Amino acid sequence: VGRPNVGKSTLLNRLVGEKMAIVSRRPQTTRTRITGIKHLPHAQVVFVDTPGLHEGTGRLGELMVRTAERALQDVDLVCLVLEATEKPERLDRAIFERLKGARVPVYAVLNKIDLVAPKSKLLALISACRAAFAFKEIVPVSAESGENCERLLALIVAAMPQRPPHFPRESLTDQPETFWVAETIREKIFRLTNQEVPYACAVRVAEISERKRPECLYIRASIFVERDSQKGILIGKGGATLKRIGTTAREDLERFFGIKVFLELTVAVRRNWRTDDRALKEFGFLLTS
């Protein structure tokens, strides 16, 4: 868990060793709970990436925060990801308050140490963290470069209770294929569009099927926005933006599935879907309890 844009998704991808979560420089890219499974010779660790803890605005923002908070109740260990570049006096005390009710060990993971020089600057932040909360461990890492991530993984494994594996060894996640297709498309939207457009987009995958002639995986998906102006921006002049989104998403999906992919994308307007419980449930965001 952690504030938006502190590198939680990059860290998940690094620890699992596969791309499990979409990554963007914009905050609040992750909207739902994402599970990644790390298989080791002597252990299986199930990681849960959550939306950033923030003051949720609007119905979708509220649900994202509830998803993150609910994840705290279902795990054996919590890693609070903080930016190593944060000044000690600017540490967010509110997030420590949210963690006081945690019934499991909490680690502070100080991410982005590759941006800190000299490393001695970390000492003040580590001291501030110790004074603010009873962390079981404080681990400086760089999810981007991988520095110290092996040590973090070892500390996580050591803290895990012994129980039978939850998943088969070939499993990397418990999410369906449609989820990963939608997330891949959404990542490209975040990277190739600006301002409010990526936040106003939802992706629904209507079909994934194998085709014989030519042999490929056929995927049909729709991107929903809230206004006609957003639709125009997403499509772009002569369809150029939508084509780039489709091409870059298809390339990632071909690597993911290991087969040629034909990706058909359409754009539709679903007005105010972020405040509509029916639409949120349709797009997989609404919690049922």
Q: How should each PLM-predicted stretch be described?
A:
Residues 1-77, 82:
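Conserved G1/Walker A P-loop phosphate-binding module
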Residues 7, 148, 241:
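Conserved glycine(s) of the Walker
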Residues 14, 18, 37-41, 56, ...:
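Conserved, well-folded catalytic cores of nucleic-acid-processing
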Residues 30, 54-55, 87-88, 116-117, ...:
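Catalytic P-loop NTPase motifs of RecA-like helicase/translocase cores
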Residues 38-44, 63-138, 209-214:
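Conserved C-terminal guanine-recognition region of P-loop GTPase G domains, centered on the G4
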Residues 104-107, 114-173, 177:
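Canonical P-loop GTPase G-domain recognition
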Residues 177-289:
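P-loop NTP-binding site
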